[in-house]
Amino acid sequence: MSITKEEVAEAVRAWCRAWDTHDVSTILAMEAQASGFGFRPFARRDQAAVGERGYLQMLERFFSEMEYFHLRLEDLQTAVIGEVGCAWGRHVEEFQEKGRPPERARVRFTKVLTKGTHGWQVLLYHRDIQPFGDDGRYPRSLTIVSPAPAAT
């Protein structure tokens, strides 16, 4: 079964809609076997290792801790290599955790997907929100290494 760039794009749009509408069953179907990096924790996430039930509980807990959560796709590019879909781009998350101030994150993402008998599956993903300056580059003020103090 051959996949197209357009099908990969529609799968990513469906993923975005599922997160925006809190459609836990669609998220679970697409991500239960995924592994990757999110922008909140530093450590790698492995949904397959926690199992479908464990991931379902994580999703339910995540949404229950939010006053609101919205995700809007901003930019999307896709490619297909054999039976593997690749997607990358940016989306915006607007959310407020209960008891905390509202937040807005412009997220860069990459996804590796495949289409099987149960629909689209995200295999690998990476999301980050590293700050960028007005010129679209990472601010050097965040990466400059301070000189070591002089030995006394």
Predicted regions span which residues?
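A solvent-exposed, acidic/Ser-Thr-rich amphipathic alpha-helical stretch
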Residues: 5-6, 24-82, 103-104
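Short, well-ordered beta-strand segments in beta-rich or mixed alpha/beta enzyme
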Residues: 15, 30-32, 38-41, 85-95
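Hydrophobic/aromatic beta-strand elements that line small-molecule binding cavities or substrate pockets
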Residues: 59, 73-78, 91-93, 107-114, ...
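Short, low-complexity N-terminal intrinsically disordered segments enriched in polar/charged residues
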Residues: 1-34, 140-152
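A short, hydrophobic/aromatic-rich structural module that often spans a beta strand
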Residues: 84-91, 133-151
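Solvent-exposed, non-membrane alpha-helical residues enriched in polar/charged side chains
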Residues: 9, 13-16, 56, 60, ...
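Short beta-strand edge/turn micro-motifs at domain boundaries
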Residues: 106-137
